[in-house]
Curated annotation (Swiss-Prot):
Gene: polC
Location within or outside the cell: Cytoplasm
UniProt-listed Pfam families: DNA_pol3_a_NI, DNA_pol3_a_NII, DNA_pol3_alpha, DNA_pol3_finger, HHH_6, PHP, RNase_T
A single GO molecular function term of this UniProt record: 3'-5' exonuclease activity
EC number: 2.7.7.7
Family, per entry: Belongs to the DNA polymerase type-C family. PolC subfamily.
Reaction(s) catalysed by this chain's protein: DNA(n) + a 2'-deoxyribonucleoside 5'-triphosphate = DNA(n+1) + diphosphate
HAMAP family the record matches: DNApol_PolC
PANTHER family, sorted: DNA POLYMERASE III POLC-TYPE (PTHR32294:SF5), DNA POLYMERASE III SUBUNIT ALPHA (PTHR32294)
Protein name: DNA polymerase III PolC-type
Gene Ontology BP, a term: DNA-templated DNA replication
GO cellular component, one term: cytoplasm
Top-tier EC class: transferase
Described purpose of this protein according to its UniProt entry: Required for replicative DNA synthesis. This DNA polymerase also exhibits 3' to 5' exonuclease activity.
Amino acid sequence: MSDLFAKLMDQIEMPLDMRRSSAFSSADIIEVKVHSVSRLWEFHFAFAAVLPIATYRELHDRLIRTFEAADIKVTFDIQAAQVDYSDDLLQAYYQEAFEHAPCNSASFKSSFSKLKVTYEDDKLIIAAPGFVNNDHFRNNHLPNLVKQLEAFGFGILTIDMVSDQEMTEHLTKNFVSSRQALVKKAVQDNLEAQKSLEAMMPPVEEATPAPKFDYKERAAKRQAGFEKATITPMIEIETEENRIVFEGMVFDVERKTTRTGRHIINFKMTDYTSSFALQKWAKDDEELRKFDMIAKGAWLRVQGNIETNPFTKSLTMNVQQVKEIVRHERKDLMPEGQKRVELHAHTNMSTMDALPTVESLIDTAAKWGHKAIAITDHANVQSFPHGYHRARKAGIKAIFGLEANIVEDKVPISYEPVDMDLHEDLCGLSDVETTGLSAMNNDLIQIAASKMFKGNIVEQFDEFIDPGHPLSAFTTELTGITDKHLQGAKPLVTVLKAFQDFCKDSILVAHNASFDVGFMNANYERHDLPKITQPVIDTLEFARNLYPEYKRHGLGPLTKRFQVSLDHHHMANYDAEATGRLLFIFLKDAREKHGIKNLLQLNTDLVAEDSYKKARIKHATIYVQNQVGLKNMFKLVSLSNIKYFEGVPRIPRTVLDAHREGLLLGTACSDGEVFDAVLTKGIDAAVDLARYYDFIEIMPPAIYQPLVVRELIKDQAGIEQVIRDLIEVGKRAKKPVLATGNVHYLEPEEEIYREIIVRSLGQGAMINRTIGRGEGAQPAPLPKAHFRTTNEMLDEFAFLGKDLAYQVVVQNTQDFADRIEEVEVVKGDLYTPYIDKAEETVAELTYQKAFEIYGNPLPDIIDLRIEKELTSILGNGFAVIYLASQMLVNRSNERGYLVGSRGSVGSSFVATMIGITEVNPMPPHYVCPSCQHSEFITDGSVGSGYDLPNKPCPKCGTPYQKDGQDIPFETFLGFDGDKVPDIDLNFSGDDQPSAHLDVRDIFGDEYAFRAGTVGTVAEKTAYGFVKGYERDYGKFYRDAEVDRLAAGAAGVKRTTGQHPGGIVVIPNYMDVYDFTPVQYPADDVTASWQTTHFNFHDIDENVLKLDILGHDDPTMIRKLQDLSGIDPITIPADDPGVMALFSGTEVLGVTPEQIGTPTGMLGIPEFGTNFVRGMVNETHPTTFAELLQLSGLSHGTDVWLGNAQDLIKEGIATLKTVIGCRDDIMVYLMHAGLEPKMAFTIMERVRKGLWLKISEEERNGYIDAMRENNVPDWYIESCGKIKYMFPKAHAAAYVLMALRVAYFKVHHPIMYYCAYFSIRAKAFELKTMSGGLDAVKARMEDITIKRKNNEATNVENDLFTTLEIVNEMLERGFKFGKLDLYKSDAIEFQIKGDTLIPPFIALEGLGENVAKQIVKARQEGEFLSKMELRKRGGASSTLVEKMDEMGILGNMPEDNQLSLFDDFF
């Protein structure tokens, strides 16, 4: 028996006779795991053998009881060196297992605990009746039994259930006999009742026919039974049961249709005790419609049987009856005009702290009849735009505010400083110990002080104080002071007077003096004694300013650092002396390093400008009163995030003062300085602070309840007294007192969601406070912070009396709301930046290019299109957007890069003419590059100008150029041309940073910002939070409940970010604070760009947003141009070799079998994925227009699958005629004869997936018009299936880039492969890639098998794509070389004849910096050894070893020290 185990046995007083048994001879504690949050200790024991059952139970009971006394939960398991599988011992432990969770569930225990077990053939055999030998018990309970028996010491057992026929027959016989007896008795009872009834009835004159069975009556009775049935809480269901009735809310619904046409509704419900999975079957569409009430958010009553789902292995209700019910909702029952206004409410934009969306918060207030509601998120205003729009819609006033983190600009080292020599005057070093942090609710229990002169103690003071009550365990644990120390101690007032006499005429010194002085002054005030007036030095702030590089400035860390003795930290006498020793060191360093000799110098010469970073944060609520205040609010939020961010956004008090116009201030919650002063310094101090604010906040006692657990307030009566004190503060400071709710969620049952979110932050988070210290620390409870009605708030404050409660809850909050003016948070118009002569420049550039291409005068069709577009662009102030985009594209072009367009900008011919996009939206046409003669095909017979046959100009004989994709302008700026243009551009990823800087250069640093985003908790992340909460707090949730909790916790703000390419430009005649605050992304104060504080979507119709995205295509094109010298603009879009790729592999010189695919699409942008390759195989495109169709079909939602694909397969339509891109609908319908406006409207309805959502009357109007113009029914039906459509201009830009890349694959293959591997490939495996065809194909086969088994990793999936291209390259006769230490580039692949040489970065684990360092080092000289490669090249030992294994290093020695014997050989 180990000493540690023996000690444990002593502590639990294990009987000696049991300890002396052979099983205990080598007993030991293998491990103890301590979970401090959940206060759970896990013991892992080792024994010589499985314990006798009586010994085990004794050990178990004594461990539990002993640790329970210390509020600690215990579990333990046993590893036995020898296992006895005798029947008696095994049976005893088998039955014992059912006394331990989770084996003790009622259903499992009742069905299994009395069964017999045996051990045969290395298996535990359970003989069970047939009716319990089922999947439910096998899957859900037997694994728990295995774990429990393992914990007993039996190791991991294999359990097998066998059906005991004899037992089954016996139980069945008993059941049948019992049932027959019951039936017999029931029949007898019925006969006797019938006889009695007949005796009472009059004689029957003639026989009447027997009544027919009434099915309707039976159904009615069944329905009546359903209506009156007892509702079972979901938490109580643990096993299969019949005819169970639930009531709850549906939170998830999925409808499926089987191959046989039956429908399944899988849904999940919660009654907030737990959640459940349910299933309802419907035989056909008609029956399915009867259950439309099964919808997300609906409240239902359901009845059905609980069964184990064979697929999910979880309990599921098979629903038999369902009925929609009305949920009892909380309502504000106060009369109109007597309802409160909530002035402190958080939305899900309060980072990791609150749940409701601002819309749900406002909707609830409006539903309750409140006239206004305030939004006060923590340190941000990101919910303002949505709140602004929702409040206007709901007809309620939104009060825009925030809960700010206020700090003092400079935290003083000295209070009340005077002209004194720090090195010559006497100092009184003091410290106090208290029963808590509240001077009003806790007591002084020790005051100690030491008088020091020049570092020497000359006199000491040390007195304990009797608080009049026993000390709490927490106080004793923290201070080391026990009730024994306080026996015979003097009364408080006596000690206070003596201490004042002791400290007279001394400089007072304390560590964290603000607390000590505040506590002392509160006690002096209470006993009518004079407050502290002499100078005070705070050594905490002294250390922070003198040693800012230190991370911790507490007394303990400082004494360790300076080797000052501190034997009993948190006992006042020891702390006071240690503080004195530290002060002497501080004074010496301050004099030597900063020349500080006088007390007055501490605050003036030593306090750092950034001392606000260490200042204690105090909360305050700030509200926008008017439009001036809104702009000031935006400035404050910006400054707090940009200039004063330290852990959290901070607002120094002087900064707040400078921007206070138009703002109103409240004292906030228990973390506000007025509340803190009431607790720690007294009412007088609180009144002085309260004068700074516009009103005093008080909150429901339930909000302050956690302060009782934290021992800051004694009890409920103490909370009520604090609230009365705050009201008194307001009265004396002449400030109104308002009751606010500190709302963090809407409904009481949503508390658990916030609990999960907050606990996920870990113990280090400020909001996730703990009680206690060290391993015994427990999470402090969170307040009940739901949105309260007026009635609920009045009930909370009933202790104040009816009139005063009404005043603070209703009257004062209404009065405050009346002081708030309506403000415009989001502008109603677009404000574009000003560029001198933008309108003239756009028009001039347009006509200049148009004349160059089409001649002067212009063809009518061109002239009319330009006039139409310029009227819209110039008339709506969009010229500057066009010109800015043109300038950016032109700069990138000058740096040698093409820029691809995205979205619908290619629908604008003006954009084409000024060089923003290559896509020409005019109808297909010819134009002569010499004489500008042109021909336009306007009847819709040609889909793309690139598909026109080649022909010469009839006027001059020069070969015509071909262009035009037939895209209407309306798809870009709307039918009326007034939609704000969204110009998205694809810059090369290499050039994107330069393009971003171009925006700054054009518009100015102070006007260009990255488009901000808000990152919220995703449901998958929330799922992890729920599982973590289960683990840490000993919870067990069924799967449906986990899903419900995860959904409830999702959507909360977690961080901020930036759009990958979006840049917002503020007009130079305004400033950014007219639109939004600004910040750094993800609170990274080192970021080179500031972002908009608002999500850019919230202001994208008010300011210019440029989408400057990075893309591989322009980078790839630039690489190919550099390799070949070919200008990509000259590459024809109708090259026959390129088009041949879409129909076979012959043009590549390989067979489909060699490369594993029937076409040459591998590695071609837009067309290389498995999905699109499959579409190509089915449709066989031969023209550019058909490629546009494919691009549209592959990017749309429900456009190809279940729609166009079926139409083509069935021969109803062709690739050319199906609906592919959104613009095709408008063009097709206009060609069919519909009015342009209706054609446009139909296109908009279809492309947004609204066709089936609009009214039947509107839809039928469109259908009638289409049929009148001979639009086929299949086309109309296809419209109804579409959810989203791709713009044709986007497709055209992408396809054009793709064909340019494909051109090189066909005609300059080695260059293509070099560019592909340098830019597009995501994963490499050089050993395989340079190992030849067999190695490549073998690895591909390996990954294919893994994919089939769903075992392939993401890296392997990316590698497979790379290997497909490697395989193709090798099959075409090219070679993949090995990494070469002296030839390989750092980043780019190199071409050596018909061979590609990989770069260093392609080696797994070798990053860009090391790759560049190796190249630089080899230029300085040859690597003579592996050691030198590591040293000069920066390669790790692992990388060098990997290079050696691949044969890259040849015979390179380990080091370049020659052996003594090398000279002889």
